[in-house]
């Protein structure tokens, strides 16, 4: 399920990038292997992708990047613990490929099989009653490889939060500022944990106007010599001002909830990473 959601987000980013060109490459033609990204040693200059490239997260390079963040920037693997993975029962249903539907805003139908390529899907898995009924991969993704989860991180953090609430380890009626004292003077200070989890906080934050500062705070790249802003997402959260009354309306801030969620979950169980990462 998480993988399916991940790929929906990946397509959204790709579509935005592709809208900039008159005739975008098809899913088949933009396949990273077909494009030849990072193949051979050393890869040719015109097929090399670096984190410092201004277009590393732009289509068609994006289709390679989303599976190779560990080669591009610092990150940390999260252990699944000593118990190991629990195998899922498999009962694949080939008939799903012929299921048809009418996309939003369209006049004609398409099949599930046709939608896979139309959405530039890298991979998808469908679970029904605990069984894998559909699983398919393309592009950079393989059954044993990694893929950026993007905003699915919010779903994972939200699920962990609800588990802690159910276990009595996280009080969703508590003020965020009491759970994390560093945030008491920020917009989060007088918001309840539940309001933050439900995205009903009133934040003076715009994904257009403020995203650059937010991204600069968490970027692993060196800051300019004259930079005086926050140097991590956690520092950035402390600068966010209130922009209304908490709890009155749902307002998704795509970049904002996840760093807070990670910080609050760690505070609730008093378990912290060995160092304070920026992301």
Locate the predicted segments by residue.
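Catalytic-site signature segments of enzymes, centered on catalytic residues
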Residues: 135-137, 143-144, 208-210, 218-279
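Active-site helix/loop module of the DD-peptidase/beta-lactamase fold
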Residues: 143, 152, 166-208, 239, ...
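Solvent-exposed, polar/charged alpha-helical surfaces in well-ordered, non-transmembrane soluble domains
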Residues: 110, 114, 158-159, 174, ...
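N-terminal leader/targeting segments and the immediately adjacent pre-domain N-terminus
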Residues: 17-141, 198, 202
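Bacterial N-terminal signal peptides
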Residues: 2-14
């Amino acid at each position: 399920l998480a993988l399916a959601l991940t790929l929906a987000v990946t397509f959204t980013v790709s579509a935005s990038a592709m809208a900039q060109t008159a005739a975008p490459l098809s899913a088949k033609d933009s396949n990273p292997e077909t494009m030849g990204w990072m193949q051979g040693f050393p890869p040719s200059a015109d097929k090399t992708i670096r984190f410092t490239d201004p277009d590393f997260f732009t289509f068609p390079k994006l289709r390679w990047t989303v599976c190779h963040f560990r080669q591009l920037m610092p990150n940390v693997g999260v252990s699944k613990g000593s118990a190991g993975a629990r195998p899922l029962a498999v009962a694949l249903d080939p008939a799903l490929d012929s299921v048809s539907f009418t996309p939003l805003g369209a006049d004609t139908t398409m099949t599930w099989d046709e939608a896979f390529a139309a959405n530039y899907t890298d991979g998808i898995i469908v679970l029904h009653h605990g069984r894998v009924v559909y699983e398919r991969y393309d592009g950079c993704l393989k059954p044993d490889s990694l893929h950026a989860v993007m905003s699915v991180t919010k779903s994972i953090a939200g699920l962990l939060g609800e588990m802690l609430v159910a276990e009595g380890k996280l009080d969703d009626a508590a003020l965020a500022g009491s759970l994390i004292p560093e945030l008491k003077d920020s917009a989060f200070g007088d918001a309840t944990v539940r309001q933050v989890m439900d995205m009903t906080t009133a934040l003076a934050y715009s994904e257009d106007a403020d995203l650059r500062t937010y991204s600069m705070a968490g970027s692993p790249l060196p800051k300019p010599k004259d930079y005086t802003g926050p140097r991590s997402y956690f520092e950035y959260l402390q600068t966010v001002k209130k922009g209304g009354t908490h709890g009155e309306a749902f307002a998704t801030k795509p970049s904002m909830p996840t760093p807070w969620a990670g910080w609050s979950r760690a505070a609730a169980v008093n378990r912290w990473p060995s160092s304070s990462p920026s992301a």
